[in-house]
């Protein structure tokens, strides 16, 4: 609880910098609006599946894989912050503001691999759009929402089949590249949907453990680029404010939480 409170304080501090840049650029902050069908009452895991399907429908996403989830959520008015975290993979928060609607924030762990970041983003989105009832475990419901949001049931069944005695590692790697999720998340999803049974699930996880995929640094094959799900909007706004001479280099570096030298190096990379 203490770590979560400290993390929330850091997130609020970073959010204030984010909103400052928007104000300096005289931009109207994109406000979070609940999807039309939310909040979804979740009395069992099927309701979590339905919630994910409804959010995709409300946002016009169809059943296609989502290429960049952090970018999509920022377009929807959620501020995505990437911080160095220890014990926590992520959290969602609502920060009240004077004279404006509350800002919605999702914090993700900077050092996580991209597939994990994507799942955590979808999990935290789940917390924002579902309303568990009847003793349903909220974490499990958010997890199920995340799996359904990133790997729609109909698409996965069409790709894999409805009932399988086993799935090859090669097949899982191909599906991982298609959906942008970890092999382990895919295997859990196949079990949740009844595509594989508990015995097949256990056999696969034994192979994952033997290959070292179950422990840090989680070196699965065909892992996505680490920066793919790093939020980019705040940094872009800082560069824009600098280019428009709204702020100087020292202020831009301060807002980004880096040294002027590091800022210069980043600007050189952007220009290259």
PLM segments and residue spans:
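Active-site hotspot residues in diverse enzymes, especially metal/ion-binding acidic/histidine motifs
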Residues: 1-272
């Amino acid at each position: 609880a203490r770590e979560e409170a400290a993390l929330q304080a850091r997130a609020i501090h970073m959010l204030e910098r984010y909103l400052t840049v928007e104000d300096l650029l005289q931009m109207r902050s994109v406000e979070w609006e609940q999807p039309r069908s939310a909040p979804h009452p979740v009395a069992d895991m099927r309701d979590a599946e339905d919630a994910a399907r409804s959010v995709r429908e409300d946002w016009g996403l169809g059943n296609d894989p989502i290429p960049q989830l952090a970018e999509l959520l920022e377009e929807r008015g959620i501020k995505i912050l990437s911080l160095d975290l220890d014990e926590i993979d992520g959290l969602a928060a609502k920060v009240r503001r004077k004279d404006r609607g509350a800002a919605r924030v999702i914090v993700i762990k900077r050092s996580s691999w991209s597939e994990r970041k994507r799942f955590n983003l979808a999990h935290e989105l789940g917390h924002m759009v579902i309303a568990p009832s009847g003793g349903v475990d909220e974490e499990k419901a958010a997890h199920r929402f995340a799996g359904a949001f990133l790997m729609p049931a109909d698409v996965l069944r069409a790709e894999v089949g409805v009932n399988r005695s086993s799935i090859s590692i090669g097949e899982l790697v191909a599906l991982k590249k298609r959906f942008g999720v970890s092999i382990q998340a895919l295997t859990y999803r196949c079990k949740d949907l009844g595509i594989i049974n508990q015995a097949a699930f256990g056999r696969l996880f034994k192979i994952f453990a033997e290959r070292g995929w179950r422990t840090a640094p989680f070196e699965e094959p065909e892992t996505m680029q680490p920066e793919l799900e790093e939020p980019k909007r705040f940094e872009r706004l800082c560069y824009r404010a600098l280019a428009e001479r709204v702020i100087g280099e020292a202020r831009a570096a301060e807002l980004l939480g880096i040294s002027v030298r590091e800022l210069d190096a980043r600007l050189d990379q952007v220009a290259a």
